[in-house]
């Protein structure tokens, strides 16, 4: 079995080593559920990596948003450079699910934009899970959504070996069955091309290399990887396993059976509408499904094919849909599931099923979809935790749910290798809180440090930002309408010192790593609620736990139970770390995180901004520009700069239209 190898100049600290040993021993003893309770800045990610190394199991790491998933993917790629670290999030740049609003008689068509690089990474994850053992997949909630049958996907592979007898015509037909398309003019992922006795295949999950097959009659005479852009031979291989272009590709027999089953359900549903005298729904469903059946028969797919997933995967009504978990389980080996920031992730998993079902029930009721579409759904929480996996829930503030689930197997990690103490906490009257905060913030900013302020309302945030700007503070407001790209720009600007204070309502998300922030202010801290609960307050306080001068001010006229619990927990941890530092002579130091590595600048090339010149340019010259842009697009995607890669992709598409 392949072994996980950690690449790091650090070794686990005493506290990390203790947590790793306890977790590994617990899992090996047969305890399915375990909790790592680790404070902010204690190195939970490094602990997770060491658990993976010692257990030596394929691992799925899940978190609740794409930003954290990207951060974790980058970190684990660094920890395991010799192993297969994969990335599995939604491949949509934009996604609007189909929906129907009965009171307005308004049907909203599904609209989406697929990010080809994210799609490639998803395919790479499933392909490598079937081929290797040393696989870590970092995923968002996408891992809970339906995928094709892994057994069907595995059955669609093409096994190639040097010297084998292989008829070229049969090879090309097999490639078409696997979803590959012939394209001799423009060679892209998911394509193949033929030039005499040479067949080039661009696997859908490869980055910038393809595979070349050279035949001598019906014998596979040579096989090697080559760089697509430069057409250079890079690596000879004697064996190669080619996977299909999608997890939803099915064999001919399965497709024929699926079409028959869909036709039977359609007949049954149409009879229901006819009996109920609902002629509009009757006609609507008949027209939509018959069109889909025609497309499935002729092309093997159709728009919204996922709504027929139950039939295409051969499952029964109500069965748990196939998901990424099944690609781990198909080998029959033990695997590990790590749920990062579990106090947020698990409640989100719980809510996914209900939201998806309520939308689809309306579509089914009004004849836009067959009832079987309800089986194309995310996993329920009880299905999620019933998988044949070992679970590790990771959080600074785990909920009672995961603590109960683990039956006491909760392992703390509350010492920071940097010696940093939890922030000092001050409770100050909320009378004149705006003026008091202004004075405190000015002192912090004068030291070259940053300030985060959390308020309860959008109006308060806007007014506070405007007021402080008038008083000369460089401050910005992070509101709920900004997208992930703008959010990262704001965080980058704060870290670089372009402004000194960031104001928001729920901006202090889990995993936000800002070593420059030394003051966190919570206005109206005594207003009990979701944003002022014990968990939220501890998470908010943690944003000041990466700076040696970290301080939290709670503006309140009374101390609520949530405040008291959060303060008591933080002060106990502060004392524990302080005693440890004193015992071992550790001097606290601020955490460090390389700004350029963590937040890369967008720098789109300016090769294509003069349309008139490009139109007059010879096709061969335009092809050179496309080649250069494609190279930059692949490089951007490799560096996880997906917005930049998407912009380059769009420009390439424009150039090809000229």
Curated annotation (Swiss-Prot):
PROSITE patterns: HELICASE_ATP_BIND_1, HELICASE_CTER, UVR. ATP binds at residues 38-45. Keywords: ATP-binding, Cytoplasm, DNA damage, DNA excision, DNA repair, Excision nuclease, Helicase, Hydrolase, Nucleotide-binding, SOS response. Residues 25-182 form the Helicase ATP-binding domain. Residues 433-596 form the Helicase C-terminal domain. It is found in: Cytoplasm. GO terms for cellular component: cytoplasm; excinuclease repair complex. One of its GO terms (molecular function) is excinuclease ABC activity. Pfam families: Helicase_C, ResIII, UVR, UvrB, UvrB_inter. Residues 623-658 form the UVR domain. GO terms for biological process: nucleotide-excision repair; SOS response. A motif (Beta-hairpin) lies at residues 91-114. Signal peptide: none annotated. The keyword DNA repair applies. Forms a heterotetramer with UvrA during the search for lesions. Interacts with UvrC in an incision complex. Belongs to the UvrB family. The beta-hairpin motif is involved in DNA binding. The UvrABC repair system catalyzes the recognition and processing of DNA lesions. A damage recognition complex composed of 2 UvrA and 2 UvrB subunits scans DNA for abnormalities. Upon binding of the UvrA(2)B(2) complex to a putative damaged site, the DNA wraps around one UvrB monomer. DNA wrap is dependent on ATP binding by UvrB and probably causes local melting of the DNA helix, facilitating insertion of UvrB beta-hairpin between the DNA strands. Then UvrB probes one DNA strand for the presence of a lesion. This is UvrABC system protein B.
């Amino acid at each position: 079995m392949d072994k996980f190898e950690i690449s790091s100049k650090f070794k686990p600290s005493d506290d990390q080593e203790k947590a790793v040993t306890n977790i590994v021993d617990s899992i090996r003893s047969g305890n399915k559920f375990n909790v790592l309770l680790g404070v902010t800045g204690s190195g939970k990610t490094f602990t997770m990596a060491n658990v993976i190394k010692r257990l030596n199991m394929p691992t799925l790491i899940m978190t609740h948003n794409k930003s954290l998933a990207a951060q974790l993917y980058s970190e684990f790629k660094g920890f395991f450079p010799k192993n297969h670290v994969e990335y599995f999030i939604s491949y949509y740049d934009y996604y609007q699910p189909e929906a129907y609003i009965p009171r307005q008689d308004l049907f909203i068509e599904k609209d989406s934009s697929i990010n080809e690089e994210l799609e490639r990474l998803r395919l790479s994850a499933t392909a490598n899970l079937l081929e290797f053992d040393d696989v870590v997949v970092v995923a968002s909630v996408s891992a809970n959504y339906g995928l094709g049958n892994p057994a069907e996907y595995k059955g669609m592979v093409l096994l190639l070996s040097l010297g084998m007898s292989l008829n070229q015509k049969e090879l090309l037909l097999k490639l078409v069955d696997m979803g590959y398309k012939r394209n001799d003019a423009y060679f892209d992922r998911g394509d193949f091309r033929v030039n005499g006795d040479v067949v080039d295949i661009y696997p859908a999950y490869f980055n910038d290399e393809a595979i070349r097959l050279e035949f001598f009659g019906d014998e596979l005479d040579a096989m090697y990887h080559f760089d697509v852009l430069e057409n250079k031979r890079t690596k000879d291989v004697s064996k190669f396993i080619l996977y299909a272009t999608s997890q939803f590709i099915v064999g001919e027999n399965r497709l024929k059976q699926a079409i028959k089953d869909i036709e039977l359900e359609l007949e049954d549903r149409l009879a229901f509408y006819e009996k109920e005298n609902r002629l509009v729904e009757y006609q609507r469903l008949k027209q939509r499904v018959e069109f889909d059946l025609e497309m499935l028969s002729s092309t093997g797919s159709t728009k919204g094919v996922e709504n027929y997933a139950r039939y295409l995967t051969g499952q029964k009504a109500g069965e748990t849909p196939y998901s990424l978990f099944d690609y781990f389980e198909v080998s029959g080996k033990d695997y590990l599931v790590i749920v990062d920031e579990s106090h947020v992730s698990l409640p989100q998993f719980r809510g996914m099923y209900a939201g998806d079902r309520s939308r689809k029930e309306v579509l089914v009721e009004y004849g836009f979809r067959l009832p079987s579409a309800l089986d194309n759904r995310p996993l329920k929480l009880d299905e999620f935790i019933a998988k044949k996996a070992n679970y590790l829930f990771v959080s600074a503030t785990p909920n009672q749910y995961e603590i109960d689930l683990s039956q006491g197997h909760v392992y703390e990690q509350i010492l920071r290798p940097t010696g940093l103490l939890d922030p000092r906490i001050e409770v100050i009257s909320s009378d004149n809180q705006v003026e008091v905060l202004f004075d405190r913030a000015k002192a912090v900013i004068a030291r070259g440090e940053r300030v985060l302020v959390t308020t309860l309302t959008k109006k308060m945030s806007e007014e506070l930002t405007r007021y402080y700007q008038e008083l000369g503070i460089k401050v910005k407001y992070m509101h709920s309408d900004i997208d992930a790209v703008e959010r990262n720009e704001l965080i980058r600007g704060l870290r670089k010192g372009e402004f000194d204070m960031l104001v928001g309502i729920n901006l202090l998300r889990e995993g936000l790593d800002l070593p420059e922030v030394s003051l966190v202010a919570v206005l109206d801290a005594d207003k009990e609620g979701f944003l002022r609960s014990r968990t939220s307050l501890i998470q908010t306080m943690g944003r000041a736990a990466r700076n040696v001068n970290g301080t939290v001010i709670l503006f309140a006229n009374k101390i609520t139970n949530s405040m008291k619990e959060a303060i008591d927990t933080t002060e106990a941890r502060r004392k524990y770390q302080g005693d440890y530092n004193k015992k071992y002579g550790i001097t606290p130091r601020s955490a460090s995180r390389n700004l350029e590595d963590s937040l890369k600048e967008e720098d789109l090339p300016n090769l294509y901004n003069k349309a008139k010149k490009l139109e007059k340019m010879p096709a061969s010259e335009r092809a050179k520009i496309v080649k250069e842009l494609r190279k930059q697009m692949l490089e951007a995607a490799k560096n996880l700069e997906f917005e930049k890669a998407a912009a380059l992709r769009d420009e390439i598409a424009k150039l090809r239209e000229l």
